[in-house]
Amino acid sequence: MSPKFNLLNLIYGCWLFCLLIPIFKLNCFGEESFNINLTRELKQGNFLIGLKQYLGAENDGLLERKNITFTTKNDFLELNSFNGVKHKSKKINIVFKKIALKTPLKVERLVFGPFASYESAQRKAENLREKGYEAQVAYPKDWEVWIPVDQKLPDKKFNYKLFEKSYDSKIIPFLVNEYSHQKLLGPIFISSSEEIIIDGINYGKKFYLAKDAYGTWTLIQKIQFDDYLKGVLPYEIGSNSPLEALKAQAVIARTWALYNSERFNIDQYHLCTNTQCQVYKPPKLKY
């Protein structure tokens, strides 16, 4: 590792220590809360990053059998699910399955959009809230604003459409090994004291699998502010940039992330990794 890289890490740490809010002591390993609280995570100095979105969908990018595998080299992984499943091993394999519903589930909502950006969707949502509507920003494929269908219909000049769909199945994750298939309810917390390898890629130590607003699932990384910025700066400005430029960009990136941390509230995480947010790759990522 080059002296300049070590110096950059030292500067990141010192600079960010002065910038960040105090980080409260985290819960003990294996005792993570199952209720994802986005505000609490920010107060504790953490971002929740949606690494893989829409898991379980037909085009989610997973293998045909739709599984996701977590492994470690030395230490054990721990899995805890909302429905009480606990598992400890060096390999965890989760498979997403479509399970038929006994009774079809009808979903209805009023939809505004699509919008070209989160900012324009958020402005519409704020406008609707001022008029008394329970508006939420969502990102199923494009930025949209949703309000419940049972609220008094706004004037047609608002240019909304009625979304109606009946679902006869839902996507459920299962913990699968050679001995059993265990149904999991989310959020699902997976952690280790060492870095976790996910589908062959080296990531971090703490993850959630959480259901989103669209019936699919998201792999969410829990990461502290300073580590998040280390995963942003090389792609926003370049790690070889002058140190003063790196420090200035660190302030800009942190401010942007905090200001935009409500983008994916409806899906239980703060930020994504693509161009809808700051470009981010886990700082420990190795292929």
What are these regions (language model features)?
Residues S2-Y287:
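Conserved, single-site charged/polar hotspot
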